[in-house]
Amino acid sequence: MSSGLRAADFPRWKRHISEQLRRRDRLQRQAFEEIILQYNKLLEKSDLHSVLAQKLQAEKHDVPNRHEISPGHDGTWNDNQLQEMAQLRIKHQEELTELHKKRGELAQLVIDLNNQMQRKDREMQMNEAKIAECLQTISDLETECLDLRTKLCDLERANQTLKDEYDALQITFTALEGKLRKTTEENQELVTRWMAEKAQEANRLNAENEKDSRRRQARLQKELAEAAKEPLPVEQDDDIEVIVDETSDHTEETSPVRAISRAATKRLSQPAGGLLDSITNIFGRRSVSSFPVPQDNVDTHPGSGKEVRVPATALCVFDAHDGEVNAVQFSPGSRLLATGGMDRRVKLWEVFGEKCEFKGSLSGSNAGITSIEFDSAGSYLLAASNDFASRIWTVDDYRLRHTLTGHSGKVLSAKFLLDNARIVSGSHDRTLKLWDLRSKVCIKTVFAGSSCNDIVCTEQCVMSGHFDKKIRFWDIRSESIVREMELLGKITALDLNPERTELLSCSRDDLLKVIDLRTNAIKQTFSAPGFKCGSDWTRVVFSPDGSYVAAGSAEGSLYIWSVLTGKVEKVLSKQHSSSINAVAWSPSGSHVVSVDKGCKAVLWAQY
């Protein structure tokens, strides 16, 4: 390398090596400098002694020569001289031996020092490697520390932001809590005033009805009194024959002729006032019942005498609502069809022939409808809603009669009890509530522990299907769970067979199960390769005679299973383009209706 290059021109690693060598030289020179100086002095002495030894050796050879040259010298002097030379040689020999000894020691010391220096070099290299590793670790730790400081700053800023937001939310919450308290008080006051006004209105209505009744009674009494003054011919088809049925002894065997003649005799011998009172009592008793039951709806043996036909053809496809349709139900007489959707309305349709004609709409709900049910007479319709309430309308005039509020979550199912005077509702707030329609209040609240998706009722038992995969059986009188059954999936729907001895359930594991309520055991399980439960509120239904079960699938097909064989009886498809939410089978057994998540409803029949 050229001597003209400066130190700065060398690479960094060369400069580093040079600095390390100079540093090592400074550290090690102080320790070995004195030894090296002494060693050099000893070498100089050794060289001097070597020269002296050579000189003495030369003189040793010269002495005999001088004796040979000058044999006449004095012998005594020569002996003395020889003794001195011998002593001097012995002395030099000892000094030489001592010097050789010291030289060996110094050589050994040099070897030891060299070994020690090599060990120190290795230690220094190891230390340098450790130092480099430590420096790298320090660099990494400094980088990590810098990152952590950055993250800490970010977290502190985020924490401060969250704290500010929390303080703001706390202030807002305090203000809203005050407003809520004030609004609650105002609402309570308004409810109190509203109840008082309703009571006054009811009293006024009752008074008007009483006045009308009195006027009708007075007019009727007047007309009957005028008619009683005229002679009454005895005819076999006279309506006064009803009195005979009420006053005659039922244990006595009488013929129709004897009954009629006895009625005529009693009528002729009876004063006008008694006859008038009897007729008035008859008409009065006829006007007592405010909830008449149509004769075609009375069925002492549910499902008996009904011809159920498995549907095979879509008779009518129509858009039932503006959006998703969640519920569908036939009236007890199979004449009316009710549908409920997310457009907050319940719509009534009249089924005749192969058509469904729109009859009217029931409004008043503030959110989507989740379930629908008619009472046993078909006069009232009950609907549950996502606005935390259930509502009752009269079917004849489409008027909203009752609004049942009290749940803190959306009401997913509401059903009439068999007496039609009480209602059970199940909600997403994990409670079931029992309502009395006479007093229009909630008389019982039961905490179920899980969101309730559907409800069915018997005389004294309420069965509820829940999100936690359990079916719970409640005793209405004791408000306690009689028993519960856990399935493999979340329960979406329940239904009872006509005899109310078997319970049909649908769950999110895509299985339908029939449970025998007498043995509390699963009797049958229905499934199909293409069947899939589409939502947490997919409804299923028994046929009116309990021979079939029907359910809609997520891909839009309607599946019908035979209870007798346990196999799929029919699969109806190509009409729905989205998941089927609910299915209803008409009480007459001739029609089936399915509704989907789109807006469609399909009327199915056998022909």
From Swiss-Prot:
Similarity remark: Belongs to the WD repeat ATG16 family.
Cellular compartment(s): Cytoplasm; Preautophagosomal structure membrane; Endosome membrane; Lysosome membrane
Phosphoserine carried by residues: 139, 269, 287
Keyword Transport found: yes
Positions occupied by motif Caspase cleavage: 296-299
Protein name from the UniProt record: Autophagy-related protein 16-1
Organism annotation: Homo sapiens
GO CC annotations, alphabetized: Atg12-Atg5-Atg16 complex; autophagosome; autophagosome membrane; axon; axoneme; cytosol; endolysosome membrane; glutamatergic synapse
Classification via PANTHER family: AUTOPHAGY PROTEIN 16-LIKE, AUTOPHAGY-RELATED PROTEIN 16-1
Domain notes for this protein: The WD repeats are required for non-canonical autophagy but not for canonical autophagy. The WD repeats are required for the recruitment of LRRK2 to stressed lysosomes.
WD repeats: 320-359, 364-403, 406-445, 447-484, 486-525, 532-573, 575-607
Gene Ontology biological process terms in this record: autophagosome assembly; axonal transport; C-terminal protein lipidation; corpus callosum development; defense response to virus; dendrite arborization; hippocampus development; macroautophagy
Region of interest (Interaction with ATG5), residue spans: 13-43
Principal location: cytoplasm
Subunit organization: Homodimer. Homooligomer. Heterooligomer with ATG16L2. Interacts with WIPI1. Interacts with WIPI2. Interacts with RB1CC1; the interaction is required for ULK1 complex-dependent autophagy. Interacts with ATG5. Part of the minor complex composed of 4 sets of ATG12-ATG5 and ATG16L1 (400 kDa); this complex interacts with ATG3 leading to disruption of ATG7 interaction and promotion of ATG8-like proteins lipidation. Part of the major complex composed of 8 sets of ATG12-ATG5 and ATG16L1 (800 kDa).
Pfam families hit by this protein: ATG16, WD40
Coiled-coil portions: 78-230
Region (WIPI2-binding) location: 207-230
Impact noted for substituting residue 490 to A: Abolished non-canonical autophagy without affecting canonical autophagy. Impaired conjugation of phosphatidylserine (PS) to LC3 proteins
